[in-house]
Design a protein with these regions (language model features):
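Alpha-helical transmembrane bundles and membrane-interface segments of multipass inner-membrane proteins
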Residues: 1-128
């Protein structure tokens, strides 16, 4: 796409991000199911107040990425990675990885700098 900087390169990733933990398909499937369950719980508990919309977007991005990679793993036994920043020799990744990474980074930012402890009380497992 941009010679020497950004290329499309086909790679079959049987591991986690950046090729770690190869051949652990069941583990990744279970992690994805746990993440989706946690997101479903948080969405269920989330007030409909517009203040929580950025949080919902982050959770949906993480879910979309998890589902995208899970579909690849279940249907093919591996995730297809194809985006490669050659300039910095960054590990090959895919769009689902972008969704998970950006969603998680924004989620951390929101929790650290936007929401207060009392905003997050609605997600507590304790009876209120």
């Amino acid at each position: 796409l941009i010679k020497g900087v950004f290329e499309l390169l086909y790679s079959e990733n049987r591991g986690a991000a950046f090729g770690m933990m190869q051949e652990k398909q069941l583990f990744f499937f279970l992690i994805a199911v746990l993440v989706l369950g946690a997101v479903a719980y948080l969405i269920y508990k989330m007030p409909s107040d517009g203040k929580y919309r950025p949080l919902a977007v982050c959770l949906m991005m993480i879910s979309a990425g998890a589902v995208g990679n899970m579909i690849d793993r279940v249907s093919q036994g591996y995730v297809v990675d194809f985006l490669y920043f050659k300039l910095i020799n960054f590990p090959i990744f895919n769009v689902a990885d972008c969704y998970v990474t950006i969603g998680a980074a924004c989620l951390v930012f929101l929790i650290m700098f936007y929401y207060k402890d009392e905003d997050m009380a609605c997600f507590s497992l304790k009876k209120q």
